[in-house]
Amino acid sequence: MEEDLFQLRQLPVVKFCRTGESARSEDDTASGEHEVQIEGVRVGLEAVELDDGAAVPKEFANPTDDTFMVEDAVEAIGFGKFQWKLSVLTGLAWMADAMEMMILSILAPQLHCEWRLPSWQVALLTSVVFVGMMSSSTLWGNISDQYGRKTGLKISVLWTLYYGILSAFAPVYSWILVLRGLVGFGIGGVPQSVTLYAEFLPMKARAKCILLIEVFWAIGTVFEVVLAVFVMPSLGWRWLLILSAVPLLLFAVLCFWLPESARYDVLSGNQEKAIATLKRIATENGAPMPLGKLIISRQEDRGKMRDLFTPHFRWTTLLLWFIWFSNAFSYYGLVLLTTELFQAGDVCGISSRKKAVEAKCSLACEYLSEEDYMDLLWTTLSEFPGVLVTLWIIDRLGRKKTMALCFVIFSFCSLLLFICVGRNVLTLLLFIARAFISGGFQAAYVYTPEVYPTATRALGLGTCSGMARVGALITPFIAQVMLESSVYLTLAVYSGCCLLAALASCFLPIETKGRGLQESSHREWGQEMVGRGMHGADVTRSNSGSQE
C-alpha cells in the first residue's frame, strides 16, 4: 500500500489510533520515528520537539497528559467574586447604552417644541444616532477581534462619554444632529461588553449571567425616566444629557481593573498572558487552577467577514441579521410610539386615536406632562419582568424557541391596539409588548456570542448589532412620521415584522442550549485526518477493485 509522508514542524509527534485517540510509547520516543494508523493506512511521521513552555495545540495533545483549554479552566474555576465584579463593570457600560437610547424618546418632544422642529427633523434626530451606531458596529467588532475586547470596549466608551457631554452644549439643531451622530458611533461598540463578559462565564451559568447584564439595561432605562422627571422641569434637557453620562464616567474610572479575554489572548498567541489572567480569576474566586499545559485550538485567521458566510454559518448569519433588525426596529419603535400615544391622550377607537395623534404630532406641540412621564415609567419598568421571564424560559425552551415566543407575543399585543382601548388598557398592552420584545433582545444577546467561534465572535456580534441599528434607523420614520398618516398601517408593520422574525428564529440551524463556547470553526485536526485517511483508504480499495 502506498505510504504518504507528512512533515510536522514544531508539533509533538503522537500515534493516532483508529478511533481517533492518541497514544505515545517509550519505543516511539526512543526511535524518533512514529506511525499514524488510520483504517490500515500507515503514514510515517518525523518527530520534532516543542520549545520549552510552548503551548500544545489541542489537536496534537496527548489525552493522557495533564492539559487543559481556556474553556476547561473557566469551567473548573466557576462563577465567583471575579464574575460578580465583571458583571457590575460591564453592566455600567450597558446601563449607559440604555440611557443614551431612552433619552431619545424624551429629547425628541422637548426639542420639537423648544426649537419648533417639524416631525421629519425630530425623526432625523433619532435616526442619526442609529446611523452612527450602524456605521461603527462592524468596525468595533473588527477592532475587538484584532486588538482585544478590552481595547475596543474602552475606546468606544470614552468616545461616547466625550461626545455625549459635548452634545449638551449644542447651540443649534445642526450641531446637536452631528454630535448625537458621533455619540451613536461610540455606542456601536458597547455591545462588545457582552462578548468580553461571555468569554469569562462557565457554560451552565452563561445564559443567566448574560441576562444579568440585561438587568443593567432595564435599570438604565428606568433611571433615565426618573432622572428626566426631576431634571427636565427645573434644569432642562442640557443637564439631562450631562447627567446621563455618569455611568460612562464611572466605567472610564474603573476600567483599569478590566482584564483582557483569555480566549482572545490564546488566539493571539499570548498564552502566558492568558494563564496569568486565569490564575487571577482562580485566586479571586478561591478556586483551584487546572494543572498541566494550556492547549490551543487550531490557529486560524481572525475577524474576517467571509468567515461569517462559510457553509456552516451562512444561514445562521443571514437569519440572525434579520432577527436583530426586527428586534431593534420593533423595540425602539415601541419606545417612540409610547410617548406619541400617551401624548394623544385617553382615546377609544382607532379613528379617534389617529386624529388625536395627528393633532399632537403637528407643529402645535405639547411638552410631556407629569402623567406622560409616569406612564412612560410604568412601561419602562416592564424591562424587569421581561428579564425574569426570559431567564426562566431560555434554558427550558432553548434560545430559538424563546426568541420566537417573544416575537409572537409582541405581535399579538400590537394587533390588540387595533381595538377600542382606554389609556389604562393601552398602558398594560404597551407594558406586555415591551416586556417581551426586550426579552427577545436578551435572548438574541445570549444566542449570538454562543453560536460563533472565538475567532469571529466579536465580528459576528458586531455585524448583528449593525443590522439592529439599521432597524433602529428606519423606525423613527414609522413611529413618528407614518403614525401621522395611519395608525393601522404603523401597527401592522411592527406586528408583521415580528411574525417574520419569529419564523426566522425557528429556522435557525443551530441551537446553542447546553453547548460550550466554540474555540474554532473547524473540526478537530485529528478528526479531519481520520476522515481523510478513511476516504483515502476507500479510494485505494476502489482502485484495487477496478484493477482486478
UniProtKB/Swiss-Prot annotation:
It is a multi-pass membrane protein. Keywords: Cytoplasmic vesicle, Membrane, Phosphoprotein, Synapse, Transmembrane, Transmembrane helix, Transport. Residues 1-87, 144-156, 202-209, 260-316, 395-401, 446-457, 511-548 are cytoplasmic. Pfam families: MFS_1, Sugar_tr. PROSITE patterns: MFS. Gene3D superfamilies: MFS general substrate transporter like domains. The chain crosses the membrane at residues 88-108, 123-143, 157-177, 181-201, 210-230, 239-259, 317-337, 374-394, 402-422, 425-445, 458-478, 490-510. GO terms for molecular function: transmembrane transporter activity. InterPro entries: MFS, MFS_dom, MFS_sugar_transport-like, MFS_trans_sf, Orgcat_transp/SVOP, SVOP-like_MFS_dom. It is found in: Cytoplasmic vesicle, Secretory vesicle, Synaptic vesicle membrane. GO terms for cellular component: basal plasma membrane; synaptic vesicle membrane. Its main location: membrane. GO terms for biological process: xenobiotic transport. CDD domains: MFS_SVOP. Residues 109-122, 178-180, 231-238, 338-373, 423-424, 479-489 are vesicular. The modification Phosphoserine is found at residues 25, 31, 542. Belongs to the major facilitator superfamily. This is Synaptic vesicle 2-related protein. It comes from Pongo abelii. The lineage of its organism: Eukaryota, Metazoa, Chordata, Craniata, Vertebrata.
